[in-house]
Protein backbone atom coordinates (compact mmCIF):
# COMPACT_ATOMS: atom_id res chain seq x y z
CA UNK A 1 0.00 0.00 0.00
CA UNK A 2 1.54 3.31 -1.08
CA UNK A 3 1.55 6.45 1.05
CA UNK A 4 -1.00 8.00 -1.33
CA UNK A 5 -3.33 5.01 -0.93
CA UNK A 6 -2.85 5.17 2.84
CA UNK A 7 -3.80 8.85 2.84
CA UNK A 8 -6.82 8.21 0.62
CA UNK A 9 -7.99 5.37 2.88
CA UNK A 10 -7.67 7.65 5.90
CA UNK A 11 -9.77 10.21 4.03
CA UNK A 12 -12.46 7.57 3.57
CA UNK A 13 -12.38 6.88 7.31
CA UNK A 14 -12.77 10.59 8.04
CA UNK A 15 -15.71 10.79 5.64
CA UNK A 16 -17.32 7.79 7.32
CA UNK A 17 -17.01 9.56 10.67
CA UNK A 18 -19.03 12.41 9.18
CA UNK A 19 -21.72 9.94 8.09
CA UNK A 20 -22.15 8.34 11.52
CA UNK A 21 -24.77 10.78 12.90
CA UNK A 22 -27.14 10.28 9.97
CA UNK A 23 -26.65 6.51 9.98
CA UNK A 24 -27.38 6.48 13.72
CA UNK A 25 -30.55 8.49 13.08
CA UNK A 26 -31.66 5.95 10.46
CA UNK A 27 -31.03 2.88 12.62
CA UNK A 28 -34.69 2.31 13.50
CA UNK A 29 -35.82 3.01 9.95
CA UNK A 30 -33.27 0.47 8.76
CA UNK A 31 -34.79 -2.15 11.05
CA UNK A 32 -38.30 -1.28 9.90
CA UNK A 33 -37.30 -1.49 6.24
CA UNK A 34 -35.54 -4.86 6.84
CA UNK A 35 -32.68 -3.80 4.58
CA UNK A 36 -30.34 -0.86 4.31
CA UNK A 37 -32.03 2.30 3.02
CA UNK A 38 -30.92 3.30 -0.46
CA UNK A 39 -29.62 6.60 0.90
CA UNK A 40 -27.28 4.75 3.27
CA UNK A 41 -25.80 2.65 0.48
CA UNK A 42 -25.45 5.72 -1.73
CA UNK A 43 -23.69 7.60 1.07
CA UNK A 44 -21.23 4.72 1.55
CA UNK A 45 -20.65 4.66 -2.20
CA UNK A 46 -20.14 8.41 -2.34
CA UNK A 47 -17.43 8.44 0.35
CA UNK A 48 -15.57 5.57 -1.30
CA UNK A 49 -16.18 2.90 1.32
CA UNK A 50 -16.55 0.09 -1.22
CA UNK A 51 -13.25 1.03 -2.88
CA UNK A 52 -11.18 0.23 0.23
CA UNK A 53 -10.48 -3.40 -0.72
CA UNK A 54 -11.03 -3.01 -4.46
CA UNK A 55 -8.02 -3.40 -6.79
CA UNK A 56 -6.26 -0.30 -8.05
CA UNK A 57 -6.90 -1.33 -11.66
CA UNK A 58 -10.62 -0.78 -11.00
CA UNK A 59 -10.19 2.53 -9.18
CA UNK A 60 -9.85 0.98 -5.74
CA UNK A 61 -7.48 1.65 -2.86
CA UNK A 62 -6.45 -1.98 -2.21
CA UNK A 63 -5.76 -0.78 1.33
CA UNK A 64 -4.45 -2.28 4.53
CA UNK A 65 -7.33 -4.56 5.64
CA UNK A 66 -7.07 -3.18 9.17
CA UNK A 67 -8.35 0.15 7.83
CA UNK A 68 -11.30 -1.57 6.17
CA UNK A 69 -12.24 -3.39 9.38
CA UNK A 70 -11.84 -0.16 11.35
CA UNK A 71 -14.39 1.43 9.02
CA UNK A 72 -16.88 -1.40 9.54
CA UNK A 73 -16.36 -1.25 13.30
CA UNK A 74 -17.23 2.44 13.32
CA UNK A 75 -20.32 1.92 11.19
CA UNK A 76 -21.54 -0.92 13.42
CA UNK A 77 -21.07 1.27 16.50
CA UNK A 78 -24.04 3.38 15.39
CA UNK A 79 -26.11 0.80 13.48
CA UNK A 80 -25.44 -2.92 13.70
CA UNK A 81 -27.20 -3.74 10.44
CA UNK A 82 -25.27 -1.10 8.52
CA UNK A 83 -21.96 -2.30 9.92
CA UNK A 84 -22.81 -5.91 9.14
CA UNK A 85 -23.84 -5.33 5.52
CA UNK A 86 -21.00 -2.92 4.80
CA UNK A 87 -18.47 -5.43 6.13
CA UNK A 88 -19.82 -8.36 4.15
CA UNK A 89 -20.53 -6.57 0.87
CA UNK A 90 -17.31 -4.58 1.18
CA UNK A 91 -15.08 -7.64 1.55
CA UNK A 92 -16.52 -9.11 -1.64
CA UNK A 93 -14.40 -6.68 -3.66
CA UNK A 94 -11.38 -8.38 -2.09
CA UNK A 95 -12.81 -11.79 -3.03
CA UNK A 96 -13.58 -10.83 -6.63
CA UNK A 97 -10.02 -9.55 -7.00
CA UNK A 98 -8.87 -13.17 -6.68
CA UNK A 99 -11.07 -14.37 -9.56
CA UNK A 100 -9.87 -14.67 -13.14
CA UNK A 101 -9.49 -11.29 -14.88
CA UNK A 102 -12.39 -12.18 -17.19
CA UNK A 103 -14.75 -12.43 -14.20
CA UNK A 104 -13.57 -9.06 -12.90
CA UNK A 105 -14.19 -7.50 -16.30
CA UNK A 106 -17.71 -8.93 -16.44
CA UNK A 107 -18.60 -7.42 -13.06
CA UNK A 108 -16.64 -4.14 -13.05
CA UNK A 109 -15.88 -3.51 -16.74
CA UNK A 110 -18.80 -1.14 -17.33
CA UNK A 111 -19.29 0.01 -13.74
CA UNK A 112 -16.54 -0.42 -11.12
CA UNK A 113 -19.06 0.49 -8.39
CA UNK A 114 -21.04 -2.73 -9.01
CA UNK A 115 -21.64 -4.58 -5.73
CA UNK A 116 -21.73 -8.31 -4.96
CA UNK A 117 -23.62 -10.22 -2.27
CA UNK A 118 -22.94 -13.77 -1.10
CA UNK A 119 -24.08 -16.88 0.63
CA UNK A 120 -21.07 -19.11 1.14
CA UNK A 121 -22.76 -21.95 3.01
CA UNK A 122 -22.90 -25.07 0.77
CA UNK A 123 -26.64 -25.06 0.10
CA UNK A 124 -26.27 -26.07 -3.51
CA UNK A 125 -23.69 -27.39 -5.94
CA UNK A 126 -22.25 -27.08 -9.41
CA UNK A 127 -22.15 -30.12 -11.66
CA UNK A 128 -19.29 -30.21 -14.16
CA UNK A 129 -20.46 -29.66 -17.74
CA UNK A 130 -18.65 -28.62 -20.90
CA UNK A 131 -16.95 -25.27 -20.25
CA UNK A 132 -18.11 -24.83 -16.69
CA UNK A 133 -20.77 -25.87 -14.20
CA UNK A 134 -24.53 -26.27 -13.97
CA UNK A 135 -25.48 -24.75 -10.62
CA UNK A 136 -28.59 -25.43 -8.56
CA UNK A 137 -29.49 -24.60 -4.98
CA UNK A 138 -31.25 -22.37 -2.50
CA UNK A 139 -28.88 -20.25 -0.44
CA UNK A 140 -30.04 -18.57 2.76
CA UNK A 141 -28.70 -15.46 4.52
CA UNK A 142 -27.44 -13.29 1.66
CA UNK A 143 -26.90 -10.01 3.52
CA UNK A 144 -27.32 -6.88 1.41
CA UNK A 145 -28.52 -8.84 -1.62
CA UNK A 146 -31.04 -6.14 -2.59
CA UNK A 147 -28.16 -3.75 -3.21
CA UNK A 148 -26.08 -6.13 -5.34
CA UNK A 149 -26.01 -6.97 -9.04
CA UNK A 150 -24.02 -10.21 -8.64
CA UNK A 151 -23.60 -12.85 -5.98
CA UNK A 152 -21.15 -15.48 -4.77
CA UNK A 153 -22.73 -18.79 -3.77
CA UNK A 154 -20.68 -21.51 -2.14
CA UNK A 155 -20.70 -25.22 -2.66
CA UNK A 156 -18.99 -28.32 -4.02
CA UNK A 157 -18.13 -29.12 -7.60
CA UNK A 158 -19.67 -32.47 -8.55
CA UNK A 159 -18.14 -34.74 -11.20
CA UNK A 160 -19.35 -38.26 -11.89
CA UNK A 161 -21.58 -37.98 -8.83
CA UNK A 162 -18.72 -37.12 -6.46
CA UNK A 163 -17.45 -33.84 -4.98
CA UNK A 164 -14.05 -32.97 -6.49
CA UNK A 165 -13.62 -29.35 -5.41
CA UNK A 166 -15.21 -26.69 -3.21
CA UNK A 167 -15.48 -22.95 -3.68
CA UNK A 168 -17.60 -20.04 -4.87
CA UNK A 169 -19.65 -19.58 -8.03
CA UNK A 170 -20.16 -16.03 -9.34
CA UNK A 171 -23.64 -15.43 -10.77
CA UNK A 172 -25.34 -12.27 -12.18
CA UNK A 173 -28.58 -10.91 -10.72
CA UNK A 174 -30.56 -11.88 -13.83
CA UNK A 175 -29.93 -15.56 -13.13
CA UNK A 176 -31.11 -15.95 -9.53
CA UNK A 177 -34.27 -15.19 -7.59
CA UNK A 178 -34.38 -13.34 -4.26
CA UNK A 179 -36.99 -14.69 -1.85
CA UNK A 180 -38.05 -12.11 0.74
CA UNK A 181 -37.96 -14.17 3.94
CA UNK A 182 -35.95 -12.00 6.37
CA UNK A 183 -38.31 -11.66 9.39
CA UNK A 184 -35.98 -12.05 12.35
CA UNK A 185 -35.20 -10.96 15.91
CA UNK A 186 -31.82 -9.32 15.26
CA UNK A 187 -29.89 -7.75 12.39
CA UNK A 188 -33.31 -7.01 10.97
CA UNK A 189 -31.99 -4.33 8.66
CA UNK A 190 -29.54 -6.55 6.79
CA UNK A 191 -31.99 -7.92 4.22
CA UNK A 192 -30.32 -11.33 4.48
CA UNK A 193 -32.74 -13.04 2.14
CA UNK A 194 -32.65 -16.35 0.27
CA UNK A 195 -31.20 -16.77 -3.22
CA UNK A 196 -32.63 -19.45 -5.52
CA UNK A 197 -30.56 -20.70 -8.45
CA UNK A 198 -32.08 -23.11 -10.98
CA UNK A 199 -30.06 -24.75 -13.76
CA UNK A 200 -27.71 -21.81 -14.22
CA UNK A 201 -24.60 -22.30 -16.33
CA UNK A 202 -21.50 -20.77 -14.72
CA UNK A 203 -18.41 -20.65 -16.96
CA UNK A 204 -15.21 -22.03 -15.51
CA UNK A 205 -13.63 -18.60 -15.03
CA UNK A 206 -16.46 -17.62 -12.69
CA UNK A 207 -15.60 -20.32 -10.14
CA UNK A 208 -12.83 -19.99 -7.55
CA UNK A 209 -11.84 -22.83 -5.26
CA UNK A 210 -10.84 -22.22 -1.66
CA UNK A 211 -7.76 -24.35 -2.30
CA UNK A 212 -6.57 -21.88 -4.94
CA UNK A 213 -7.11 -19.04 -2.49
CA UNK A 214 -5.21 -20.81 0.26
CA UNK A 215 -2.20 -21.81 -1.85
CA UNK A 216 -1.97 -18.48 -3.71
CA UNK A 217 -2.75 -19.91 -7.15
CA UNK A 218 -5.95 -17.89 -7.63
CA UNK A 219 -6.14 -16.48 -11.15
CA UNK A 220 -6.71 -12.91 -10.00
CA UNK A 221 -3.26 -12.71 -8.42
CA UNK A 222 -1.82 -12.42 -11.93
CA UNK A 223 -3.28 -8.91 -12.21
CA UNK A 224 -3.84 -7.99 -8.55
CA UNK A 225 -0.58 -8.61 -6.75
CA UNK A 226 -0.90 -6.15 -3.85
CA UNK A 227 -0.19 -7.68 -0.41
CA UNK A 228 -3.82 -7.46 0.71
CA UNK A 229 -4.83 -10.09 -1.87
CA UNK A 230 -2.51 -12.61 -0.26
CA UNK A 231 -4.27 -12.36 3.10
CA UNK A 232 -5.65 -15.73 4.28
CA UNK A 233 -9.32 -16.42 3.62
CA UNK A 234 -9.36 -17.89 7.13
CA UNK A 235 -8.55 -14.45 8.51
CA UNK A 236 -10.47 -12.17 6.15
CA UNK A 237 -13.80 -13.99 6.16
CA UNK A 238 -14.13 -14.52 9.94
CA UNK A 239 -12.88 -11.01 10.74
CA UNK A 240 -15.53 -9.66 8.37
CA UNK A 241 -18.06 -11.16 10.78
CA UNK A 242 -16.41 -10.27 14.09
CA UNK A 243 -15.39 -6.67 13.34
CA UNK A 244 -18.98 -5.37 13.22
CA UNK A 245 -19.89 -7.36 16.34
CA UNK A 246 -17.10 -5.63 18.24
CA UNK A 247 -18.43 -2.39 16.80
CA UNK A 248 -21.85 -3.20 18.20
CA UNK A 249 -20.23 -3.70 21.60
CA UNK A 250 -18.69 -0.23 21.38
CA UNK A 251 -22.11 1.13 20.45
CA UNK A 252 -23.81 -0.67 23.33
CA UNK A 253 -21.15 0.64 25.71
CA UNK A 254 -21.64 4.24 24.59
CA UNK A 255 -25.43 3.89 24.85
CA UNK A 256 -25.16 2.39 28.33
CA UNK A 257 -22.82 5.07 29.67
CA UNK A 258 -25.03 7.84 28.28
CA UNK A 259 -28.14 6.23 29.77
CA UNK A 260 -26.57 5.57 33.16
CA UNK A 261 -25.32 9.12 33.38
CA UNK A 262 -28.92 10.37 33.44
CA UNK A 263 -30.66 7.43 35.10
CA UNK A 264 -32.32 7.62 38.52
CA UNK A 265 -32.81 4.18 40.05
CA UNK A 266 -36.39 4.07 41.29
CA UNK A 267 -35.83 0.82 43.19
CA UNK A 268 -33.01 2.30 45.24
CA UNK A 269 -34.61 5.37 46.87
CA UNK A 270 -33.89 7.63 43.92
CA UNK A 271 -30.16 6.97 43.80
CA UNK A 272 -28.42 8.26 40.70
CA UNK A 273 -26.91 5.39 38.74
CA UNK A 274 -23.70 7.31 38.19
CA UNK A 275 -23.20 7.43 41.97
CA UNK A 276 -23.36 3.64 42.26
CA UNK A 277 -19.78 2.29 42.59
CA UNK A 278 -20.85 -1.09 41.22
CA UNK A 279 -22.11 0.58 38.04
CA UNK A 280 -18.63 1.99 37.55
CA UNK A 281 -17.08 -1.43 38.05
CA UNK A 282 -19.34 -2.92 35.38
CA UNK A 283 -18.51 -0.29 32.79
CA UNK A 284 -14.79 -0.56 33.52
CA UNK A 285 -14.88 -4.34 33.06
CA UNK A 286 -16.89 -4.02 29.86
CA UNK A 287 -14.63 -1.31 28.45
CA UNK A 288 -11.54 -3.40 29.13
CA UNK A 289 -12.96 -6.51 27.51
CA UNK A 290 -14.23 -4.66 24.44
CA UNK A 291 -10.89 -2.92 23.96
CA UNK A 292 -9.07 -6.23 24.40
CA UNK A 293 -11.34 -7.86 21.83
CA UNK A 294 -10.59 -5.18 19.27
CA UNK A 295 -6.87 -4.90 19.95
CA UNK A 296 -6.36 -8.63 19.52
CA UNK A 297 -8.61 -8.90 16.49
CA UNK A 298 -7.14 -6.00 14.56
CA UNK A 299 -3.62 -6.59 15.86
CA UNK A 300 -3.48 -10.01 14.24
CA UNK A 301 -4.78 -8.62 10.95
CA UNK A 302 -2.09 -5.93 11.09
CA UNK A 303 0.63 -8.46 11.90
CA UNK A 304 -0.34 -10.65 8.95
CA UNK A 305 -0.51 -7.72 6.56
CA UNK A 306 2.85 -6.35 7.71
CA UNK A 307 4.51 -9.66 6.88
CA UNK A 308 2.96 -9.73 3.42
CA UNK A 309 3.91 -6.10 2.77
CA UNK A 310 7.50 -7.05 3.64
CA UNK A 311 7.39 -9.92 1.15
CA UNK A 312 7.27 -12.61 3.82
CA UNK A 313 5.01 -15.60 4.39
CA UNK A 314 2.46 -15.72 7.22
CA UNK A 315 3.38 -18.58 9.56
CA UNK A 316 0.62 -21.01 10.44
CA UNK A 317 1.07 -20.12 14.10
CA UNK A 318 -0.09 -16.56 13.40
CA UNK A 319 -3.03 -17.72 11.29
CA UNK A 320 -4.16 -20.04 14.08
CA UNK A 321 -3.75 -17.24 16.61
CA UNK A 322 -5.80 -14.89 14.45
CA UNK A 323 -8.61 -17.43 14.27
CA UNK A 324 -8.44 -18.06 18.02
CA UNK A 325 -8.61 -14.38 18.84
CA UNK A 326 -11.34 -13.73 16.28
CA UNK A 327 -13.85 -16.00 18.01
CA UNK A 328 -12.61 -14.73 21.36
CA UNK A 329 -13.34 -11.16 20.22
CA UNK A 330 -16.91 -12.12 19.41
CA UNK A 331 -17.31 -13.90 22.75
CA UNK A 332 -15.89 -11.00 24.75
CA UNK A 333 -18.11 -8.54 22.92
CA UNK A 334 -21.28 -10.54 23.52
CA UNK A 335 -20.44 -11.02 27.21
CA UNK A 336 -19.76 -7.30 27.62
CA UNK A 337 -23.02 -6.31 25.95
CA UNK A 338 -24.90 -8.77 28.16
CA UNK A 339 -23.27 -7.34 31.29
CA UNK A 340 -24.21 -3.80 30.31
CA UNK A 341 -27.73 -4.66 29.18
CA UNK A 342 -28.50 -6.51 32.40
CA UNK A 343 -27.51 -3.42 34.37
CA UNK A 344 -29.49 -0.95 32.26
CA UNK A 345 -32.89 -1.27 33.93
CA UNK A 346 -36.32 -1.76 32.40
CA UNK A 347 -36.10 1.36 30.25
CA UNK A 348 -33.53 -0.49 28.14
CA UNK A 349 -36.37 -2.70 26.90
CA UNK A 350 -37.95 0.19 25.02
CA UNK A 351 -37.82 0.05 21.23
CA UNK A 352 -36.34 3.54 21.42
CA UNK A 353 -33.40 2.41 23.56
CA UNK A 354 -30.36 1.82 21.31
CA UNK A 355 -28.82 -0.74 23.67
CA UNK A 356 -31.58 -3.30 23.11
CA UNK A 357 -30.99 -3.14 19.37
CA UNK A 358 -27.23 -3.61 19.82
CA UNK A 359 -27.98 -6.52 22.17
CA UNK A 360 -30.27 -8.21 19.63
CA UNK A 361 -28.02 -7.51 16.67
CA UNK A 362 -24.88 -8.81 18.36
CA UNK A 363 -26.57 -12.03 19.45
CA UNK A 364 -27.91 -12.49 15.91
CA UNK A 365 -24.39 -12.04 14.54
CA UNK A 366 -23.00 -14.50 17.07
CA UNK A 367 -24.85 -17.43 15.48
CA UNK A 368 -22.82 -17.10 12.27
CA UNK A 369 -20.74 -20.22 11.70
CA UNK A 370 -17.50 -18.20 11.72
CA UNK A 371 -18.11 -17.53 15.41
CA UNK A 372 -18.16 -21.15 16.59
CA UNK A 373 -15.46 -20.99 19.28
CA UNK A 374 -14.81 -24.69 19.67
CA UNK A 375 -13.81 -25.15 16.02
CA UNK A 376 -11.35 -22.26 16.17
CA UNK A 377 -9.91 -23.26 19.53
CA UNK A 378 -9.34 -26.83 18.35
CA UNK A 379 -7.34 -25.51 15.38
CA UNK A 380 -5.09 -23.61 17.77
CA UNK A 381 -4.85 -26.49 20.23
CA UNK A 382 -4.01 -28.98 17.50
CA UNK A 383 -1.17 -26.75 16.32
CA UNK A 384 0.20 -26.41 19.85
CA UNK A 385 0.37 -30.19 20.10
CA UNK A 386 1.89 -30.61 16.64
CA UNK A 387 -1.28 -32.11 15.18
CA UNK A 388 -3.00 -31.34 11.85
CA UNK A 389 -5.37 -28.34 12.10
CA UNK A 390 -8.49 -30.42 11.48
CA UNK A 391 -10.27 -27.49 9.79
CA UNK A 392 -9.76 -25.43 6.64
CA UNK A 393 -11.03 -22.09 7.98
CA UNK A 394 -7.65 -20.81 9.12
Curated annotation (Swiss-Prot):
Entry's EC annotation: 1.14.14.12
Domain of life of the source: Bacteria
Binding site for FMN: 84, 118-120, 141-143, 263, 346-347, 368-369
Record bears the keyword Oxidoreductase: yes
Gene Ontology CC: cytoplasm; plasma membrane
Subunit text: Homotetramer under anaerobic conditions. HsaAB monooxygenase consists of an oxygenase component HsaA and a reductase component HsaB.
Family: Belongs to the HpaH/HsaA monooxygenase family.
Name this protein carries in UniProt: Flavin-dependent monooxygenase, oxygenase subunit HsaA
Organism: Mycobacterium tuberculosis (strain ATCC 25618 / H37Rv)
Amino acid sequence: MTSIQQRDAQSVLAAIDNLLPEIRDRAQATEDLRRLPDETVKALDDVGFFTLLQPQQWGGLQCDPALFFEATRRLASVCGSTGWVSSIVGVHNWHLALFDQRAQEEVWGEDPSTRISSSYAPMGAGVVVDGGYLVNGSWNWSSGCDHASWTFVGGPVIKDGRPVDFGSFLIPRSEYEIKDVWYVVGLRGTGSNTLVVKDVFVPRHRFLSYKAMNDHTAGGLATNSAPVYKMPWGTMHPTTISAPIVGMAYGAYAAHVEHQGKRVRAAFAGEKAKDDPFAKVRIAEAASDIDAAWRQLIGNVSDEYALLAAGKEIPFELRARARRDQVRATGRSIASIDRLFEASGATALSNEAPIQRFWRDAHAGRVHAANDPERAYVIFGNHEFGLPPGDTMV
